[in-house]
Amino acid sequence: MSSIIRYDWTAEELHALFDLSLPELLYRAASVHRQHFDPAEIQVSTLLSVKTGGCPEDCSYCPQAQRYDTGVTAQKLMDVDAVVAKARQAKLAGASRFCMGAAWRSPKDRDIPKIASMIREVKALGLETCATLGMLNTCQAQALKDAGLDYYNHNVDTSPDFYDSVIHTRQYQDRLDTLAHVRDVGLKTCCGGIVGMGETRQHRVGLLLTLATLPAHPDSVPVNLLVQVAGTPLHGTQTLDPFEFVRMIAVARITMPRSMVRLSAGRESMSDELQLLCFMAGANSIFYGEKLLTTANPETERDQALFQRLGLRPMHLMENVSNKDQHHGNVHADIACKHVV
């Protein structure tokens, strides 16, 4: 199957891919994947919550929204020294990229200098940096860029026509605007969504269509499987068929051939066999560590054992070729789990 980078995908084309038999879809996705990546290499990332809970938004899936009784206690923004200590520990464990997340609608201008200090201090350790802080304006994005930030994560979450069923406090266009601000200042983008929220296949097609027709494909595409947290409105939602999740990964790989397709939240509930199918479908990135912000993640020992069983190895450094060729020569580096052979 051709791996030409396209930005003109149609909903009809994506539906046709989803409708293929699963073996045929896996074959096509794997063929595209092998044209750009080593199928035995998996990028492994880590994430630290630098400001937990108390978010004013109403995202129906999120345990950090202050309006939901989920047992998450709001905390202040961490001190720079504490973040640097965590980053130093990550580096000793083999990290080459350190991600910082804050439960904000958007950072206040007064918060930017402290975040910038975190970025500079982490960068000084020789680590790549990424952040997910909510909506940004151009000035804030530029300040983070000037501090040395490499990646910015801002998900669109779902399709435009399902979005209002999940979130009411932020518009879909707000998310697209933040992505534009991030791209405009030269930061690399990480953008994906969540499935298993009660959406239909049409909505999953709509999510991927949004991502695959952006002016530049995201450098990383996190695909999250809903983690149902008691107290959130989506707790009790019917679970997604695992094979439908695999189809989501495969179509993401075909439509965005050069992007890192990341298994993100929800991996704790996935069997080793399901994760293998996802890797065969083109997923080539995972989050590594026992916690993703406030939700559980597989223990590092389980991931190490899985890599050994499957003959996989962590991706250390790779040349990241942008889909619009604006990032030639940039290094796309994430955590390396050095104890896995």
Curated annotation (Swiss-Prot):
GO molecular function: 2 iron, 2 sulfur cluster binding; 4 iron, 4 sulfur cluster binding; biotin synthase activity; iron ion binding
All residue ranges annotated as the Radical SAM core domain in the record: 40-267
Annotated Gene3D superfamilies: Aldolase class I (3.20.20.70)
Pathway assigned in UniProt: Cofactor biosynthesis; biotin biosynthesis; biotin from 7,8-diaminononanoate: step 2/2
Cofactor note: Binds 1 [4Fe-4S] cluster. The cluster is coordinated with 3 cysteines and an exchangeable S-adenosyl-L-methionine.
UniProt-annotated binding residues for [4Fe-4S] cluster: C55, C59, C62
GO biological process per UniProt: biotin biosynthetic process
Sequence positions that bind [2Fe-2S] cluster: C99, C130, C190, R262
Cofactor entry: [4Fe-4S] cluster; [2Fe-2S] cluster
Assigned keywords, A-Z: 2Fe-2S, 4Fe-4S, Biotin biosynthesis, Iron, Iron-sulfur, Metal-binding, S-adenosyl-L-methionine, Transferase
Quaternary structure and interacting proteins, as annotated: Homodimer.
General function of this protein: Catalyzes the conversion of dethiobiotin (DTB) to biotin by the insertion of a sulfur atom into dethiobiotin via a radical-based mechanism.
Record's protein name: Biotin synthase
